[in-house]
Amino acid sequence: MKRVLAFDFGASSGRAILAEYDGGALSYREVHRFENCPRESEGHFRWDFSDLMANVRLGIEKAGAFDSIAFDTWGVDFGLLGEDGTLLGDPVHYRDGRTEGMTDEAFRTMNAGALYAATGSQIMPINTLFQLLAVKESDPETWSRAKRLLFMPDLFAHALCGADACETTIASTSQMLDARTGAWSRSVL
């Protein structure tokens, strides 16, 4: 029997679902449910990553043995890692106001039509591209210390097992992937 533990994170709650496949039928059950409570910290609205990871560990404990694990979260948000792989601060929530004015700032370098043509992504102020521009403009110390970016599902995997990868489907929410090649868009970056 194959057992997969999937974590589904929403804006205000999360849950751990254990799916089992016996070769003929698929079944699943919720093994853990928890609140997701973003908070104000360091002048920004942030995800409480330590609390979320504590709930991941609790969900793993409640699930028992499993063959694989997966994380499904909201798009656009990310964690920045330093040289040694540590998180440089709790990830900022997409509802934080730091991206106000960042689309106009970005359009000074690349107009909206060219940006859309390059990425195929709907242009929204919450997109990762504009969040990164906000970090660069308003927090140069963090910007200079950041060596890697991991989107939220990838950040959970990194915290759990040290994996460093940006999975393509979540990266597609960033406004930074080339729509034709699936690689990072050099013209956008």
Where is each model-derived feature located?
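Short helix-loop capping/hinge motifs at secondary-structure junctions, enriched
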Residues: T86, G101, E141-W143
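Carbohydrate-associated surface elements
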Residues: D96
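Conserved donor sugar-nucleotide recognition element shared by glycan-biosynthetic enzymes
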Residues: L52, V56, T99, T128
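Residue-level structural signal for beta-strand termini and adjacent loop
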Residues: H32-F34, V92-H93, I170-A171
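Short, charged, surface-exposed secondary-structure boundary motifs
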Residues: R39-G43, G101-E105, M176-D178
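N-terminal glycine/serine-rich phosphate-binding loop of ATP-dependent small-molecule kinases
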Residues: M1-G89, A117, R145
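Gly/Ser/Thr-rich active-site cleft segment
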Residues: F9-A11, Y116-L189
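Short, surface-exposed amphipathic charged segments that create phosphate/polyanion-binding patches used
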Residues: R46, A106-M110
